[in-house]
UniProtKB/Swiss-Prot annotation:
Keywords: Cytoplasm, DNA damage, DNA repair, Hydrolase. It catalyses: Hydrolyzes single-stranded DNA or mismatched double-stranded DNA and polynucleotides, releasing free uracil. It is found in: Cytoplasm. It comes from Deinococcus radiodurans (strain ATCC 13939 / DSM 20539 / JCM 16871 / CCUG 27074 / LMG 4051 / NBRC 15346 / NCIMB 9279 / VKM B-1422 / R1). This is Uracil-DNA glycosylase. The active site is at 83 (proton acceptor). One of its GO terms (biological process) is base-excision repair, AP site formation via deaminated base removal. Its main location: cytoplasm.
Length: 247
């Protein structure tokens, strides 16, 4: 009987949206089609099973922190990473950032080195907690938002890329200027999603020690502030607090 026509012209019920807790209303509205989509339900089921069998980073309450700390209406910079750190206590939902008290990873150490050369007076902190950037409108987004402990890229191809492409498209739809910072070949493939006439794309090699020669000297942070100021948007204060505690 499944091939019988629907006599009342009614479509099957769409899946109910799965909306993460404490998400800003503008993200909820922009991403509602994603939260309602079958792939997102499948991704949620996959993660539920993964957490039963493996240690998954970041912890569930932190997965959407990039969106929580930076509402869509406040985004003026997007820095795209690939997937979360896969070591203990590192990942907390912001690309390139680690929790207070955790050793600064090599890529972030190189980011600090470039900041020291690029931004007059910048002093590299002893921590790697980038929340103060997020709270200024810097969306620190990974393309994949979860990972198995010790297994880099283990959650690629499970649906996250579809979701984070939708995030990038939502930011691209903004009329006011956003600066997109794309480091490395993986991030640079997302350039095709950025079509807004007011936006600026800054791209270079990845800050990883494996490709640092294509990153050092590119001055992405001063270029970002110049682009923002030309559009009448305030610059980012890249200097991080000397001491931090996780809230």
């Amino acid at each position: 009987m499944t091939d019988q026509p629907d006599l009342f012209g009614l479509a099957p019920d769409a899946p109910r949206p799965i909306i993460p807790a404490n998400l800003p209303e503008d993200w909820q509205e922009a991403l509602l089609p994603e939260f309602s989509a079958p792939y997102f339900h499948e991704l949620t089921d996959f993660l539920r099973q993964e957490r039963k069998e493996y240690t998954i980073y970041p912890p569930a309450p932190d997965v959407f922190n990039a969106l929580r700390y930076t509402p869509l209406g406040e985004v003026k910079v997007l820095i795209l990473g690939q997937d979360p750190y896969h070591g203990p206590n590192q990942a907390h939902g912001l690309s390139f950032s680690v929790r207070p008290g955790v050793r600064v990873p090599p890529s972030l150490r190189n980011i600090y080195k470039e900041l020291t050369e690029d931004i007059p007076g910048f002093v590299a902190p002893k921590h790697g907690y980038l929340r103060s950037w997020a709270e200024q409108g810097v969306l620190l987004l990974n393309a994949v938002l979860t990972v198995r402990a010790g297994q880099a890229n283990s959650h690629q191809g499970k649906g996250w890329e579809h979701f984070t492409d939708a995030v990038i498209k939502a930011v691209n739809a903004k009329e006011e200027r956003v600066v997109f910072i794309l480091w490395g070949s993986y991030a640079r493939k997302k350039k095709k999603l950025i079509t807004g006439k007011n936006h600026v794309v800054i791209e270079s090699g990845h800050p990883s020690p494996l490709s640092e020669q294509y990153f050092f000297g590119t001055r992405p942070f001063s270029k970002t502030n110049e682009a923002l100021e030309k559009a009448g948007r305030g610059p980012v204060e890249w200097q991080l607090p000397a001491t931090v505690t996780e809230e």
